[in-house]
A protein has these predicted regions:
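Short alpha-helical scaffolding segments that buttress acidic/His motifs in well-ordered protein cores
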Residues: 44, 115-123, 151-153
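Early exported N-terminus immediately downstream of N-terminal targeting peptides
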Residues: 59-70
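Long, amphipathic alpha-helical surface segments
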Residues: 1-56, 68, 75, 82-93, ...
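Extracytoplasmic
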Residues: 39, 59-61, 114
Length: 184
């Protein structure tokens, strides 16, 4: 009886997991493998949420953890309840894929940290194919960071509809993007 109460208190018997706990676990175990800051991870994690049990997202894609899909090459077992460590490792792999896109198509290695973090967040959300030839990434490649930061507000539509959740996420990404720039 005591064990089940402890497990419930720690979130093990529920399908929801703590984004903060996953970030802490990911940075402790895999921090050397990613360049995205804790602040960048918080924006992504808070926007995505965290679920232990696989589910079909609104786009009808099997998803688990913090927005993790099979797009990273790792299959999702729809009947498996994922542990915090499994979620942290999957998310690290997904973040690395988004970072590789930002590095390759957005001149990521030259970007200020906050600009890089915001670019990783939008890439994680919409995918590399959607952003790599975008005006946002063209501005990043040209070193026009301030202009790039103002591109985020254009990325608020899904299925032709303006979504409040995307408006909120893009405002947070824009603010993060501008954080390390001296002249706003």
């Amino acid at each position: 009886m005591k064990l089940s109460k402890t497990r419930t208190a720690l979130g093990f018997s529920t399908g929801v997991c703590s984004v903060g706990a996953i970030i802490t676990l990911m940075l402790a175990n895999f921090g050397g493998e990613i360049h995205t800051s804790k602040q960048g991870l918080e924006i992504i994690g808070d926007a995505e949420g965290c679920r232990r049990d696989p589910y079909q997202c609104p786009a009808d894609v099997l998803t688990v953890g913090i927005g993790s899909t099979a797009a990273s090459g790792e299959k999702i077992d729809p009947k498996h309840r994922y542990s915090d460590l499994e979620i942290a490792e999957r998310w690290k792999n997904d973040i690395v894929i988004a970072e590789q896109c930002v590095n390759k198509y957005g001149n990521g290695k030259q970007l200020p940290q906050s600009v890089f973090d915001a670019a990783v967040s939008i890439t994680f959300n919409v995918g590399c194919g959607a952003v790599r030839n975008s005006t946002l990434f063209k501005q990043l490649r040209s070193g026009n960071y301030y202009q790039a930061c103002h591109e985020y507000r254009k990325w608020v539509y899904a299925g032709g509809k303006k979504l409040p959740g995307l408006v909120s996420r893009r405002e947070k990404e824009k603010a993060l993007c501008l954080a390390d720039l001296t002249s706003h």
